[in-house]
Amino acid sequence: MLRASIRGAGLDNLRKALTEHLDFKTSGSFWGEQTNSIESVGWLNDTERERLEEDVKAGIKFVVYSYWTPIAWVRRDGEVYRVKQKFTNTTGRHKGFTHWLEEAA
C-alpha cells in the first residue's frame, strides 16, 4: 500500500496510486483499494447508490473512499465513474484528485 498525501511529498504517490489503480492511504480519511466489492456506501444518495450497485454487478476493480463514502470507482471494463453528488469541502477536495483515475497508465 502506498502512503500518500493530498499535499507535499506524498502527492506524487497519490497520483501514482490513482493513475495505476494501486492501494493507497493518506493520514486522514482518504484512501483507495483494489477490490471487487464495497465496504460501505457511506453518505451516497439513492441515485449514486443505485449506480454503484449496478457497477458492482458489472464488476469493479478499484474504489476511492472519503470518510467511508465511495467517491469514485473503476469498473473491470476500464470505465471510471466519479460521483456527482456534493459533499463536504474536504470530500470535495478529495473528489478533485479522482480525475487522475482517468489517466490510467
Q: What function would you assign to each model-found segment?
A:
Residues 1-105:
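Terminal leader/tail segments of proteins
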